[in-house]
């Protein structure tokens, strides 16, 4: 379900997978002031496209739907690996958006090798390498679409942030190597436990909440994909789940739907969480000096919270205090330490340029004087040797 609000009118989009369609409708209130009821009015019904781009053998089985600012409708369809299907507001099929990449597994690389050797007919009979389908998506306040891929084996494109052209921004920013969910795969009693990200929520402030189907946990990241918190889990006690299905946020609260328990659990932000989010918000607004205080408070409460060291390092780096920035980056950020060191080195060279110039000039003059003196000494010795040689030859001639 996705709710789009435009000029005070709310349109509800429902992915009706049981009937192979997406329905968009508005809700009107009828009746008197004392007795009112709500009635849905269907606006558009989106069904399987009758277009050559859509494989007619694939059932139109929508699982998720969302709408962007231009009123384009994006639909996740099971068994479609080309990305999300895109429809116009009126229901016309416009193509696909944001397909995943094919993961470079050993089988894929071997198939690519054999295709170089096989004939065209033999290559056609080989099994095609296709990407994993998109599992879920969300859209932020800046109209960027985020997609997640739930896979037991693939590690490619687990989380993507897509621009209007369908390009993954995280790849260009160097975030593609980040690990989302559990950093390590666990093995227990013959079973493999690795994260399967089944849903994503992007809050109004850019915070990313990823829901892990395997462990029942929520992994919360900031807008630069730095891990903030992990909460939830599998179990029967309060705050744990059996089978998680969806995650959403409203304000600072996070809501998780458990399909087996038929319950929604609300996670309220703690005081420590509020301090961390406040520090991130101040830093993103360019208030670096003000961001230092909440980061220092976070470190006071938890000296092992590594993100606070990075936050303080970034704050001091942007203030130009590179020595202090290196001190904080040293604990948990090689890239931050390198940036601070480069800036410190540039400042050191600029502040001491005159001294360096004088030292270099003195060295050059010294080298020149030494070279000149050495050449003169060599010339004198050469002259003396030639004179001595001539005198010896003259003595032999006289004899």
In which residue ranges do the predicted regions lie?
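Eukaryotic scaffold repeat domains enriched in small/polar residues
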Residues: 1-322, 332, 339-399
